[in-house]
């Protein structure tokens, strides 16, 4: 069971391949209502799924291990599959080990400092995006300074309020003022978290205050509205898919579907590209959030699982390099190939991923 993403997975090429290799049939169940309510009912009735992937923000997250509904993974690994310790990052394990000394779950999308240093890989997805054709028609202006940002929005208001038949919404900030205009913007301005070994007050940073004044001025001049504060997720999706936003402080991972739709539309250059966004007065490169030890979704093995030995072995496989290749790349020679010693999706798969992400996900499971 997982609390997010309803793709059942079992009929895709990737999941069939994994079943053939491991003997494990994958049946993904996603809650139809409140995840904590459904899991609480399962706890009471003794019908918890074998594996549970859950966000740490869910109210039942702590209940699962504090009230004994899930196994300690360290104990299962020591008893049945010591190779588990070879495929998990030590710093991630230490971060998620509870006060009783047990590890009850492993997160995805978690990045330890050692891993980032060794591989150069991070989870950075924060971008400043503009609609490509509109931005280029405006002369690709510099928007990294308060003056440049305001002048660009003035040009937009005066000359491009409607563009190629679309009413343009000037600006969107992901998460509104609680994320897009706080930590997200501060990261673009390279505002530090600490200075001389002490916690730094990012809110009072002069460059950050200057940019907040810039957004206030933009609102006062009618250059931006309050759409980014009040639009629902469905409204944001609709506007994105229609190329209705001009610029956005938005995580790139949320734009893949929209860009695929726009690239195949009657205006194929209406997709979004990343450019240099708001910067501090020194013009420093942004300090984009690279990922954390927390990760995102964490996976537990429930005590209703009838074969915990196979469950920990399957979890170990999924965390291993072999499992990660099977999950993200599929089958060598069919969906990916090795070029210069590095695996990469075939050109056909890349084209499908960009043009039809739904088919890419449901048919191939990648």
What does each model-found stretch correspond to?
Residues 1-366:
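Extracytoplasmic/secretory soluble proteins
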